[in-house]
Amino acid sequence: MNDTLDSQLTQNAKESERRLAFLKHLQMVTNRIHATSDIDELMLELSEDVCGLFNAERLTIYAVGEDKASIVSKVKTGLSTQKNLRLPISAQSIAGHVALSRSVLNIHDVYDDAELKSISPDLRFLKEVDKRTGYRTKQMLVAPVIDLPSNELLGVVQILNTKDGKPFSEVALEGVKSLSETLAIAFSQRNKPVGLIKTKYDFLVADAVVSA
């Protein structure tokens, strides 16, 4: 019994260490995003770091298109094509569904139709992208990027495939929510006139959305 208790305590300690390391890494990433005036260039630099943070293979960040009915990829890791992906805001794709429902999804296997239908009867994975690239997507962690003061949808962050083949953890789920909030602030700053950025940021700090 003592051996079992010791084993459980050791496991809990290791889990706490992993969680702390993850949160420290996440804070470093968010600090860099807050400090930049060029979010597009920074995210290209940070894409590998974000993948490392989530122990993931690939990352895609979408922004809402000018038509407000679609999302367009702005950052893509692991794809040789430079052409942006444009997806309708609908259940026709997982990222599109997240944009439509504004919900966070942690999918264990995108090819499991039963899992997708348990989320939404119309939800499907765009297998055509895998066929075109030769890549096999399995796990997917996806979150909407929403400007909290206005409740405006700004984009979607999508993280693909854990390197160990396991589902994304609960810590990763919490982390992608924090990352999406940080990206929302960065997107808002990019879309505002220079003179309004400081006021916008101060408003968020005052409302405890972010810490200075």
Task: Go through each PLM region and give its residues.
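Acidic/proline- and glycine-rich, intrinsically disordered low-complexity segments
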Residues: 82-112
